[in-house]
Curated annotation (Swiss-Prot):
One of its GO terms (cellular component) is cell envelope Sec protein transport complex. It holds the Pfam family SecA_DEAD. This is Protein translocase subunit SecA. ATP binds at residues 89, 107-111, 514. It is a peripheral membrane protein. The lineage of its organism: Bacteria, Pseudomonadati, Pseudomonadota, Gammaproteobacteria, Enterobacterales.
Length: 840
């Protein structure tokens, strides 16, 4: 029977196992070459890079070089770091080179695994971008791996915010560049806004290897990168409406005391929307009229008051759905957004659609002007620009469908080097938040008493501080890691494995830094003023004792204080324990007051808990509860996936247009002489003008010519009198072509006159400047129009129309009009040069 089962499993392996079986054959080839590499001296080993490059130039594909190149990297790592890369790391490297997502557990050595495909793809000379979630990790990984890459004859660059154009160019020209997803994306947008090709820093996007790929391509997918400029000041409107909304909220609280009274607004926490009821609309309109912001008898839903409606909705959302210390913090008179997935502050990022200004009014800090979008792109569309893309993370399998459907990336789960022995206890659920916190504190106390380190994961700063206060009350020493102390997070998380240490971390703060059982001895050595051999040996000996005592106590114990909306985030928290076969454990404590259960859990679970008549302090621990919570999480994940997919479908429309604009702009930027382009545009513009004012081949009305003359004078500085000539030359009635030739002749004559006055080189510079400025100005206006269209397009659904199809159709029409207007404005601005020259 056992033999039959083994045979069945062998015949019907799952897809992941089949991929790994094939890749293990390549690993065997790499292992076979290991002894040959050991025989090479340092010069011979590092010279392999030049040999590989020569082979690539002769036409050999890099895939053919993979086994030998990986064997070279393994031997080099051994000599530089005194570490032998495991076979599972080789598997990870092969997966990453194959345009896939590699799921590698925490502590399996992802940083060094990335060096394998990075080295191989850098041999092409086209550049490799290694993408991290923050600047600390980019700098850390680049600094750590630099000796290895330099030994192999490759140079390493670091792309950081605030660098000069020159420094960024050096970073991007390097064989391997480390940087954050934000910085790569912003550099792309900035490159498409420059007026001189020498100011562009990026080269063609060849290969991107994304660390923590789930965080970047999924968690941050809903937030586009935006370069913006200030628009009109509307701070007074936000302040006034903030007062009115505070009034409504106060009245609503009073209304709630009487169940028979209708509320002024309804709240949908699932979709994060606040909607005015009928009586709420009547009240806000009354208050707006009394404040003088709206005229008597006007409706808030009229087209004249659409901006007021927008402000009211933003203020309601700011007060009801967004909380300080959860969604944002107030620091130095500024509202700083907290990343809901990592708990980190995101400086420089602002909510759009007036929400940020509404929160500034709510918190009574200085209201900054609303921003107008100058350029934007989503991470989804930016990373799809790369010729080759791959990524790695500790948790990807739950999102494998999304990686495949949106990015065309398969997910491969890499086995651990040592068996995973962490114990994941079932969830414990309490009726109230207070009971849950008491149970968490009790669990922490037990761990501290037996010197077991504890990592407590929370979903917000507010929750982390509630736990912190409860621990202080009990006299339990602990460290808090949240958005407020971002700078120290790596040091705090590195020492979270110290015997009896208690660390409270917001979500996945400190991600990317391993928790070493017994504490991080390397940081202790780094802190020594006189790092002599005796002191180093003493530190290592002390660490060994601590490490062994932590293992005896059960390893790192992870406590989740609440289930996250995504199972993947929960798995990331659990994954901090049990690294490299270490002992460890995890447990989640829940309450019926938790957001996930309150909003998304099924009514069956809620009813069951109520029927059981649990007493104060009692809890339920059952696998069925864990399954019910997982089901609720799947519902949320499905909803969030739909939101991201919809965002991509809409952004794909803008992306197609963005590519056209940026491609044309870059062609013009690279041209030394754009006069031929101007010449062709001039013909198109004149044809378009004639089709507007003289739609038929013959002139039917003298008034048409008068309108044409006015247009030519106002927009093109041309004084022509076709209407007067008509009395003398009746052939003009049938001479549309004659008029066309006349206009073009005068325009060209005018153009040549200016060119002679300023010189060819100056004229080229002026023309290019006009084209680029016009491109940017109209693209900015078009983006604003697209935003307005997008915000209201869902209303088409009420007319039985598909909003997505309507958006595609209308945006295409808007884009075509914008391109026509672009040509018109370019010729208009160039024609006005003579007028400017005369005035000088």
């Amino acid at each position: 029977m056992i033999f039959t089962l083994k045979l069945f499993k062998k015949l019907f392996r799952n897809r992941n196992e089949r991929i790994l079986v094939h890749m293990k054959k390549i690993v065997d080839m790499i292992n076979y070459m290991e002894k040959d590499m050991e025989k090479l001296n340092d010069n011979q080993l590092s010279n392999k890079t030049n040999e590989f490059r020569m082979q690539i130039k002769s036409g050999i594909n890099i895939e053919e070089l993979l086994p030998q190149a990986f064997a070279v990297v393994r031997e080099s790592v051994k000599r530089i770091f005194n570490i032998r890369l495991f076979d599972v790391q080789m598997l990870g490297g092969i997966v990453l080179n194959n345009r896939c997502i590699a799921e590698m557990r925490t502590g399996e050595g992802k940083t060094l695994t990335a060096t394998l495909p990075a080295y191989l793809n850098a041999l092409t000379g086209k550049g490799v971008h290694i993408v991290t979630v923050n600047n600390y990790l980019a700098h850390r990984d680049a600094t750590y791996n630099q000796p290895l890459f330099e030994f192999l004859g490759l140079n390493v660059g670091i792309n950081l915010p605030g660098q000069t154009v020159c420094a960024k160019k050096i970073a991007y020209e390097s064989d391997i560049t480390y940087g954050t997803n934000n910085e790569y994306g912003f550099d792309y947008l900035r490159d498409n806004m420059v007026f001189n090709v020498k100011e562009q820093v990026q080269r063609e996007l060849h290969y991107a290897l994304i660390d923590e790929v789930d965080s970047i391509l999924i968690d941050e997918a809903r937030t586009p990168l935006i370069i913006s400029g200030p628009s009109d000041d509307a701070s007074l409107s936000y302040l006034k409406i903030n007062e009115l909304v505070c009034n409504i909220i106060k009245r609503n609280i009073d209304h709630c005391k009487y169940p028979e009274k209708e509320e002024y607004f309804t709240v949908d926490e699932k979709s994060r929307q606040v909607v005015l009821t009928e009586i709420g609309l009547i009240l806000i309109e009354k208050l707006l009229i009394e404040s003088g912001m709206m005229g008597m008898g006007e409706s808030l839903y009229s087209s004249d008051n659409i901006i007021l409606l927008h402000h009211v909705n933003s203020a309601l959302r700011a007060h009801i759905l967004f909380a300080c210390e959860v969604d944002y913090i107030v620091k130095n008179g500024e509202i700083l957004i907290i990343d809901e997935h990592t708990g980190r502050v995101m400086p420089g990022r602002r909510w759009s659609d007036g929400l940020h200004q509404a929160i500034e009014a709510k918190e009574r800090v200085r209201i900054q002007n609303e921003n107008q979008t100058l350029a934007s792109i989503t991470f989804q569309n930016y990373f799809r620009l790369y010729e080759k893309l791959s990524g790695m993370t500790g948790t990807a399998s739950t999102e494998s469908f999304e990686f495949k459907s949106i990015y065309k990336l398969d997910t491969v789960v890499i086995p651990t080097n040592q068996p995973m022995i962490r114990i994941d206890f079932p969830d414990v659920i309490y009726m109230t938040e207070i009971e849950k916190i008491n149970a968490i504190v009790s669990d922490i106390k037990d761990c501290v008493n037996r010197k077991q380190p504890v990592l407590v994961g929370t979903v917000s700063i507010d929750k982390s501080e509630i736990i912190s206060r409860a621990l202080k009350k009990e006299g339990i020493l602990h460290k808090v890691l949240n958005a407020k102390i971002h700078a120290a997070e790596a040091d705090i998380i590195a020492q979270a494995g110290y015997p009896g240490a208690v660390t409270i971390a917001t979500n996945m703060a400190g991600r990317g830094t391993d928790i070493v059982l017994g504490g991080n001895w390397r940081s202790e050595i780094a802190a020594l003023r006189n790092a002599n051999t005796h002191a180093m040996l003493r530190i290592k000996s002390d660490w060994k004792e601590r490490h062994d005592s932590v293992l005896k106590s059960g390893g790192l114990h992870v406590i989740g204080t609440e289930r996250h909306e995504s199972r993947r985030i929960d798995n990331q928290l659990r994954g901090r324990s049990g690294r490299q076969g270490d002992a460890g454990s995890s447990r989640f404590y829940l309450s019926m007051e938790d957001s996930l259960i309150r909003i998304f859990a099924s009514n069956k679970l809620v009813d069951l808990m109520k029927r059981m008549g649990m007493k104060s302090g009692e809890s339920i621990e059952h696998p069925w509860i864990t399954k019910a919570i997982a089901h609720a999480q799947k519902k949320v994940e499905s909803r969030n996936f739909d939101i991201r997919k919809q965002l991509l479908e809409y952004d794909d429309v803008a992306n197609d247009q963005r590519r056209v604009i940026y491609e044309q702009r870059n062609k013009l930027l690279a041209m030394l002489d754009v006069s031929e382009v101007i010449h062709n545009i001039r013909y198109d513009v004149v044809d378009r003008i004639l089709n507007i004012y003289i739609p038929l081949e013959i002139i039917e009305n003298k008034k048409d010519l008068i309108k044409l003359e006015k247009c030519l004078k106002d927009d093109f500085n041309l004084v022509l009198s076709f209407s007067e000539q008509l009395d003398e030359d009746t052939s003009l009635y049938e001479g549309k072509e004659k008029i066309r030739v006349c206009i073009l002749t005068e325009m060209i004559k005018q153009y040549k006159c200016v060119k002679e006055m300023v010189g060819i080189n100056v004229m080229n510079a002026i023309e290019k400047g006009i084209i680029l400025k016009t491109f940017d100005a109209l693209w900015k206006e078009h983006l604003a129009s697209m935003d307005y269209l997008r915000q209201g397009i869902h209303l088409r659904g009420y007319a039985q129309k598909d909003p997505k199809q309507e958006y595609k159709k209308e945006s295409f029409s808007m884009f075509k009009k914008m391109l026509d207007h672009l040509q018109y404005e370019i010729i208009s601005e160039i024609s006005k040069l003579q007028k400017l020259n005369r005035s000088n």
